[in-house]
């Protein structure tokens, strides 16, 4: 399950704005917002690119975390 808050936290820690993150992923900002808000799915290549940008070790926490109530 995608964890939007974890991705946002990783971006803040890395000092990356959403606008720059979208550019680094090769998409416009509105597409990034749709993906972050669950309107569209992340592709495998986008997840791979996020790993290159933020670090491969961040991927499990962002994309495969279990929600705890």
Residues of each region from the PLM?
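The alpha-helix within a helix-turn-helix
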Residues: 11, 22, 51
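Glycine-centered signal
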Residues: 6, 30-31, 42
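Short alpha-helical DNA-recognition segment
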Residues: 15-33
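Short, basic-rich loop-to-helix N-cap that marks the start of a DNA-contacting helix
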Residues: 39-51
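A short, Lys/Arg-rich alpha-helix, primarily the initiator
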Residues: 1-16
């Amino acid at each position: 399950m995608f964890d939007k808050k974890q991705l946002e936290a990783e971006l803040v820690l890395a000092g990356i704005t959403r606008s720059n993150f979208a550019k680094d992923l090769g998409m416009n900002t509105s597409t990034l917002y749709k993906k972050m808000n669950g309107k569209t799915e992340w592709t495998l290549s986008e997840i791979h690119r996020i790993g290159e940008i933020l670090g491969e070790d961040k991927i499990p926490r962002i994309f495969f975390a279990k929600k705890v109530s």
